Amino acid sequence: MTSEYVMELFYNAMKVALIIASPLLLAALISGLIISILQAATQVNEQTLSFIPKIISVLGVISILGPWMLGVMLDYMHNLFNNIILIIK
């Protein structure tokens, strides 16, 4: 197992993690931004008000994109397990 192969494994793991986390982070960012704009417009300065919409939006994204996220993780793990001989060498 060479250092290039280790770096490739690390790169692929980080890429998969970023692909899986991006929709969740984007949903939380957009819902937080919308709630913040509404709070600024109505002058409501309650900091805990944005947590519930963020949680609901993230859970919605998980329920919609959950099978796709699981498929991406399973493809990556399937690839790792198929190439375990190359990793052990």
Curated annotation (Swiss-Prot):
<dbReference type="InterPro" id="IPR002191">
    <property type="entry name" value="Bac_export_3"/>
</dbReference>
<dbReference type="InterPro" id="IPR006305">
    <property type="entry name" value="FliQ"/>
</dbReference>
<keyword id="KW-0812">Transmembrane</keyword>
<dbReference type="GO" id="GO:0009425">
    <property type="term" value="C:bacterial-type flagellum basal body"/>
</dbReference>
<dbReference type="Pfam" id="PF01313">
    <property type="entry name" value="Bac_export_3"/>
</dbReference>
<dbReference type="GO" id="GO:0005886">
    <property type="term" value="C:plasma membrane"/>
</dbReference>
<keyword id="KW-1133">Transmembrane helix</keyword>
<protein>
    <recommendedName>
        <fullName>Flagellar biosynthetic protein FliQ</fullName>
    </recommendedName>
</protein>
<keyword id="KW-1003">Cell membrane</keyword>
<comment type="function">
    <text>Role in flagellar biosynthesis.</text>
</comment>
<keyword id="KW-0975">Bacterial flagellum</keyword>
<feature type="transmembrane region" description="Helical">
    <location>
        <begin position="55"/>
        <end position="75"/>
    </location>
</feature>
<comment type="similarity">
    <text>Belongs to the FliQ/MopD/SpaQ family.</text>
</comment>
<dbReference type="GO" id="GO:0044780">
    <property type="term" value="P:bacterial-type flagellum assembly"/>
</dbReference>
<feature type="transmembrane region" description="Helical">
    <location>
        <begin position="18"/>
        <end position="38"/>
    </location>
</feature>
<keyword id="KW-0472">Membrane</keyword>
<dbReference type="GO" id="GO:0009306">
    <property type="term" value="P:protein secretion"/>
</dbReference>
